[in-house]
Amino acid sequence: MDLQELINHPEASIVDVRTPGEFNEGHLEGTVNIPLDQVEERLDEFKKFSTPLILCCRSGMRSGRAAEFLKAQGLSDVYNGGGWTDVRLLKQ
């Protein structure tokens, strides 16, 4: 599956790891905000999301770090969606 197919998967969850301030300035409807600095302490929440789990941020750097951390914790169906505006363009 390519990224667009993953984002539009009926069971996909999208998590934005930007700060709450950045999130409030604009975000994709239906996206959950869990800032990067809270990913580790909120690991149990990530385990409850339906998959595929798509992570996004401003440019893809923070979401990439979060995705690598989650994969290292045993979550397998996790993807770095890149910047939230890119995810928005791919969402149908």
Feature map (PLM): residue ranges:
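Short, surface-exposed ligand- or partner-binding patches at beta-edge/loop junctions that are enriched
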Residues: 56
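Rhodanese-like catalytic fold shared by cysteine-dependent sulfurtransferases
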Residues: 1-13, 17-51, 61-92
